[in-house]
């Protein structure tokens, strides 16, 4: 999708959280749009949106790292095994798993 159009869609006040959830999961969305979703407080309250952003390899790493601390343990474990996300994201997810489980994860 065109970046300008995608950014306009995200800024539309009538967009639903379900629509944003689907956009956050799309791998063709420009990373600027994913960054915009990640820093939006309204969308940050929705766990599914945050999880989709964390799983999306196009989400900027800085945004993903701040999201990881809010994810549940089982989702972090899945991220440590996900070859679609960057190595840095997998390592940070593993650090958080180890911190929460006392190093047993």
Residues covered by each model-derived region:
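Alpha-helical scaffold segments
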Residues: 1-105
